[in-house]
């Protein structure tokens, strides 16, 4: 009888252990499943060039800071329209249809394409100069819809001051930009006001596509003492052409982003495109965590730093003063 009782106790104990083991195994499987479950987001980049590429790098870093990592819990559905507006529309629709939980548009045309494709999915703007003017939000502090993000606003008054410091004898500034980019038109209008207030004559040179850049720069560099280009995707994508043509007349080019100074511009009051991307990624993470785009204020990036290219200055016969060098956050030799 005692043996039977011991046998029964053993069987019960073993049964409990088996059930417990099965429970723990199931729990571990559930935890493992939860840890590998990925959030899927769509990213649309307007065109390939260094500035927008840096923004995309920053976006991934910002998402990582916010807890969303591509090797763990994040899947990015990335598309690049390569400057083709028809592709912007096609890709925007694809990103909406692909089951993404959130969308990010890098540059104004990309953000506008996504906005036209959905009013339901949250959209984060990356590098949109005038979100209100681009009809993406109704108010910067209270966007009011499914869109918020980060706005880059070139400090044009500082840019004019830098031109005066580096080329004090210049009287005429030629401004090169794309006629198809709303953000560029806004920057040009603001720059023109600041430059004219400082006593400069401003000549505008708008191009409809990168195919027109060489001929346009040839005319501009023959008539203007210096050239200026805002944050402009079309110009940036063909900046090597701008430099090669302007160098024929030794016309200095002032830009609005660092990589264009590295690519042959003389100087810039620049916004960090990478940092702008980081801010965009962190905001995307915030929305994924449950924040509402409608009441998430648009973040403004407008504090620039000076970057100069000493090598280009020497090639153009321009001496950069000690004051200019001392205020520069980066000097390219």
Q: For the regions a protein language model found, what residue spans apply to each?
A:
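Short, low-complexity disordered leader/linker segments with a strong preference
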Residues: 1-40
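An alpha-beta-alpha
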Residues: 59, 148-196, 297-312
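Hinge/cleft segment of the Venus flytrap/periplasmic-binding protein
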Residues: 286-333
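Structural motif
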Residues: 75-97, 206-220
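Flexible loop/hinge segments that line or gate small-molecule binding clefts
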Residues: 113, 119-156, 253-267
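Hydrophobic alpha-helical segments within soluble ligand-binding/sensing domains
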Residues: 131-170, 271-291
């Amino acid at each position: 009888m005692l043996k039977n009782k011991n046998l029964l106790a053993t069987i019960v104990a073993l049964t409990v252990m088996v059930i417990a083991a099965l429970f723990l195994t199931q729990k571990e499987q559930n935890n493992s499943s939860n840890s590998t479950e990925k959030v899927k987001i769509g990213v649309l980049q307007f065109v390939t060039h260094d500035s927008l590429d840096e923004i995309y790098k920053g976006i991934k870093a910002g998402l990582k800071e916010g807890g969303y990592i591509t090797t763990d819990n994040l899947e990015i559905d990335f598309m690049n329209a390569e400057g083709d507006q028809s592709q912007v529309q096609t890709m925007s629709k694809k990103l909406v249809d692909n089951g993404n939980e959130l969308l990010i548009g890098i540059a104004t045309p990309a953000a506008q394409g996504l906005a036209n494709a959905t009013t339901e999915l949250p959209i984060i703007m990356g590098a949109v100069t005038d979100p209100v003017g681009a009809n993406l939000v109704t108010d910067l502090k209270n966007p009011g819809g499914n869109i918020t993000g980060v706005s880059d606003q070139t400090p044009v008054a500082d840019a004019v001051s830098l031109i005066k410091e580096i080329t004090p004898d210049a009287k005429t500034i030629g401004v090169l930009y794309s006629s198809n980019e709303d953000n560029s038109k806004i920057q040009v209008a603001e720059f023109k006001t600041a430059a004219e207030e400082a006593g400069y004559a401003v000549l505008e040179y708008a191009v409809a596509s990168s195919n027109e850049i060489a001929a346009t720069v040839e005319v501009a560099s023959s008539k203007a003492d210096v050239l200026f280009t805002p944050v402009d995707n079309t110009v940036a994508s063909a900046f090597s052409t701008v430099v090669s043509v302007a160098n024929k007349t030794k016309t200095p080019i002032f830009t609005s982003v660092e990589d264009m100074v590295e690519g042959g511009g003389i100087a810039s009051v620049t916004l960090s495109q990478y940092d702008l991307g980081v801010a965009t990624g962190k905001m995307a993470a915030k929305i994924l965590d449950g924040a509402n785009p409608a009441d998430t204020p648009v973040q403004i990036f407008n504090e620039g730093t000076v970057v100069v290219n000493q090598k280009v200055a020497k090639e153009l016969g321009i001496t950069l003063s000690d004051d200019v060098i001392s205020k520069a956050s980066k000097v390219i030799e």
